[in-house]
Swiss-Prot record:
Gene3D superfamilies, alphabetized: P-loop containing nucleotide triphosphate hydrolases (3.40.50.300)
Pfam family, one: CLP1_P
Protein origin, superkingdom: Archaea
Source lineage: Archaea, Methanobacteriati, Methanobacteriota, Methanomada group, Methanococci
EC number: 2.7.1.78
Function: Polynucleotide kinase that can phosphorylate the 5'-hydroxyl groups of both single-stranded RNA (ssRNA) and single-stranded DNA (ssDNA). Exhibits a strong preference for ssRNA.
Key words of the record: ATP-binding, Kinase, Nucleotide-binding, Transferase
Positions annotated to bind ATP: G39, G40, V41, D42, S43, G44, K45, T46
Protein name per Swiss-Prot or TrEMBL: Polyribonucleotide 5'-hydroxyl-kinase MJ1315
Catalytic EC class: transferase
Catalyses which reaction(s): a 5'-end dephospho-2'-deoxyribonucleoside-DNA + ATP = a 5'-end 5'-phospho-2'-deoxyribonucleoside-DNA + ADP + H(+); a 5'-end dephospho-ribonucleoside-RNA + ATP = a 5'-end 5'-phospho-ribonucleoside-RNA + ADP + H(+)
Amino acid sequence: MVDNMISKAYYTTEIPEDRFEALSCIKDSQKPLKIILLGGVDSGKTTLATFLANELLNLGFKVAIVDSDVGQKSILPPATISLAFPETNFNNLYEIKPYKSYFVGSTAPIQFFGEMITGTKLLCDYAEDKADIIIVDTTGLISGSGADLKRMKIEMIKPDIIIALEKRNELKSILKPFENKIRVFYLKVYENAKSFSREERKEIRAEKWKEYFKNSKIYNIGFNDVVIGGTKVFQGEKILEDEKYLLESLFKWKILYGSKCDGRYTIVKRDLVNMPRQIDKNILYYIEPERFNNLIVGLIDEDSFCIGLGILKTIDFENETLEILTPISEEDIKNIREIRFGRIRVDENGEELGLLDRDSI
């Protein structure tokens, strides 16, 4: 059940002939070599990545795979960009364990271009002296701002080869500026490529979340034991007691936590009275504590890579602790330097409870 749900793409050599032509070029090109795969949703990028990696392994090359498709992640954990070094043939990318991951914090890249580009670049740089060939799998976001994301990734990563999987020249406008300096292969989307509905994609993601968080434990981590990032709540300095009293009196709130940074207050509160309040959110931003329930957080090491993910079960503002459910070991917990808040809420059964806007916390 898990394998059937989680794995969309499998290793097969029953693919169009033009894939073998691209493989031949890769085989004969000077190493090390960086390859980016581009294509829309359900265009066969992951199937192609699986094929290329296996064939190149068979030829004796050291291969690295950077999985940056945060919406339909093959190499767990979800909501991250992952680097893996497969050493032997594999059936699908789900079988491969990540070597390093970078936390994005969402399955929707639209508001996270910085994380998408930074993570992909850092992992490619890390792999460059450890592999002959780096294969970068990408999201299916190729129109609108998605085209900008692909352009910026190409500019930052500087691949040697781009393989574009197209139906009707939809990638030509993105890639035309690069054609004179990067080898670009335009391949047709395989006519038998399987399509997945939005609901099927959601079910696949649910199985991946559930698989990742099985065998998890609860850890309580103090505010002062780590850096807490990815939220404005802990930026700047904690508000003073007289400031807290004034705000509570003025707006009839119970303030659980408050901070101020660069002239702006951020308050976590509960309403004591149901009443209209005229508040300039550029000066005073307020958050209900429930917004943090079941929030995905990244557990970050000293090198800014993601050790693993956690589900933020509760924030105890009174005792200044975070209650986090995570499958990582107690030994790895000791290596956490930052807990970075994401923007997707998920329960331990894999159910996605909703995405948050980047500025909402």
